[in-house]
């Protein structure tokens, strides 16, 4: 856990002097994808240095592809990652009154006011890290010493999606209705998402009720997230930030991952952000593209 001083440091926009970098902290709880911050930073005077994990660089590449970030005004230092920790999972493992959390390889040591406890790292990492793309940075200017570029991608990326697909339509609808009913329209998922980079969001329109925070019907609960998922389809890199920041713990990444799975099956395997020049399946056409009738039959 971060000290009060460290928590204060987390909310600062940037480090502007070499001296201030002595307060820089990078540990198992630094899970934020900083690529979206470069939209604003790269428009300012001078060059900005940013530390990106392997998965973050996919989002950065996608922003480059969409002309949202000025690459010449950005200096990327690639940093290693063994999977970021989920404090909620640590608490659910029975750890209360936590005073410190330390990492020791594949073991997480948790000190509490009631005693110490050891947990397996794999059991308490963020859900997105269970589908890690591997240790390779697809964009960087310099790599830190702790990078393992040969770290392989994990398997089972679509296991949870397949479980949802196996449900009866009524059961699947009930699942999402229950999950989305907890939404408080805080917009955290939208604000953190690198693919949601519109200058003015369609939901921020005072002429319509979509700008209001509170949902008045179950349809509105579903509409916001379904439309957002459609808007980022083919551009979502599966960074998982939407689920990480959700205060209601809604597994929003599963909606986006379902789109990714379908796109892979319809148009061939595609990873958004893997490069900066290829065209996404939904903005490109080949004679091998799936026919609309097949999509309709598949459902």
Where are these regions (language model features)?
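Single conserved hydrophobic/aromatic residue that forms the stacking wall/gate
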Residues: 1-11
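Twin-arginine (Tat) signal peptide motif
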Residues: 6-7, 186-189, 239-242
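Active-site-flanking structural segment that lines cofactor/substrate pockets
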Residues: 15-45
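Generic beta-sheet signal
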Residues: 46-50, 74
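Gly/Ser/Thr-rich loops at beta-strand to alpha-helix junctions
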Residues: 51-59
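Short active-site loop/helix that positions an aromatic residue
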Residues: 59-66
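Catalytic cores of enzyme domains
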Residues: 70-216
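Ferredoxin-type iron-sulfur electron-transfer modules in oxidoreductases and energy-metabolism complexes
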Residues: 153-181, 195-299
């Amino acid at each position: 856990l971060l000290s009060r001083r460290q928590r204060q440091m987390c909310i600062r926009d940037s480090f502007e002097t070499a001296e201030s970098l002595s307060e820089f902290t990078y540990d198992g709880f630094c899970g934020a994808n900083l690529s979206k911050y470069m939209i604003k930073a790269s428009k300012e005077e001078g060059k900005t240095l940013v530390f990106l994990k392997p998965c973050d660089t996919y989002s950065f590449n996608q922003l480059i592809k969409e002309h949202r970030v000025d690459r010449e005004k950005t200096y990327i230092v690639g940093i290693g990652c063994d999977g970021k920790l989920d404090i909620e999972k640590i608490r659910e493992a029975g750890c209360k009154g936590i005073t410190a959390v330390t990492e020791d390889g594949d073991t997480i040591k948790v000190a509490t006011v009631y005693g110490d406890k050891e947990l397996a790292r794999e059991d308490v990492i963020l859900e997105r890290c269970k589908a890690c793309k591997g240790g390779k940075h697809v964009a960087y200017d310099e790599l830190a010493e702790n990078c393992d570029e040969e770290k392989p991608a994990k398997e089972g990326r679509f296991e949870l999606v397949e479980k949802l697909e196996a449900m009866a339509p009524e059961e699947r609808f009930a699942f999402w209705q229950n999950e989305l009913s907890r939404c408080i329209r805080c917009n955290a998922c939208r604000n953190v998402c690198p693919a949601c980079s519109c200058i003015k969001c369609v939901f921020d329109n005072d002429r319509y009720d979509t700008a209001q925070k509170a949902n008045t019907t179950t349809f509105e609960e579903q509409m916001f997230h379904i439309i957002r998922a459609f808007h980022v389809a083919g551009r979502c890199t599966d960074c998982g930030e939407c689920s990480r920041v959700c205060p209601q713990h809604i597994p929003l990444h599963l909606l986006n991952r379902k789109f990714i799975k379908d796109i892979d099956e319809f148009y061939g395997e595609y990873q958004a952000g893997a490069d900066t020049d290829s065209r996404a399946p939904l903005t490109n056409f080949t004679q091998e593209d799936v026919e609309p009738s097949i999509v309709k039959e598949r459902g």
